[in-house]
Amino acid sequence: MQDNSSHSRESASAGDDPLGIDKLTVDYDYLLYKIRDYVQSIQLDTTELCKKQNEVMVNGIIENTIDKNIAKFKELLEKCDTLENHYEMLNQLAIDNRYFQGKNRRGRK
C-alpha cells in the first residue's frame, strides 16, 4: 500500500515540475558547492607552495626542489582547468535556465 502512495506522490511531483527545475536547482547548488571547494583547495595549495618557495629561496636550497615545485604548480594548473570546466557548466546551466524561462513565458501567452 505504501508503494502505491509513494509512487503517486512521485508522479504528482513530476507533474508539478515538468521542466525539471527542481533538479536543475539542486544541480546548480551542488555545482556551486564543488566550485567553492575547488577554490578553497587551490587557495590552500597555492599558499603552501608559496611558503615552501619562500623557504627555499631564503635557505638557498634550490636545485632539488625546483622540479618538485614545478610539478606541484602543474597540479595547480590542472585544478584550475577543472575549475574552469565547472564555471563553463554554470554558464551552460544559465543558458538552459534562460531558454526554459523564455519557453515558459511563451507557453503562458
Curated annotation (Swiss-Prot):
Chain spans, region Disordered: 1-21
Alphabetical keyword list: Coiled coil, Cytoplasm, Transport
Location(s), subcellular: Cytoplasm
Disulfide bonds: none
Biased composition regions of type Basic and acidic residues, renumbered to the chain: 1-10
Coiled coil: 63-95
Function: Component of the biogenesis of lysosome-related organelles complex-1 (BLOC-1), a complex that is involved in endosomal cargo sorting.
Subunit: Component of the biogenesis of lysosome-related organelles complex-1 (BLOC-1) composed of at least BLI1, BLS1, CNL1, KXD1, SNN1 and VAB2.
Protein name according to UniProt: Biogenesis of lysosome-related organelles complex 1 subunit CNL1
Species, as recorded: Saccharomyces cerevisiae (strain FostersB) (Baker's yeast)
This protein's encoding gene: CLN1
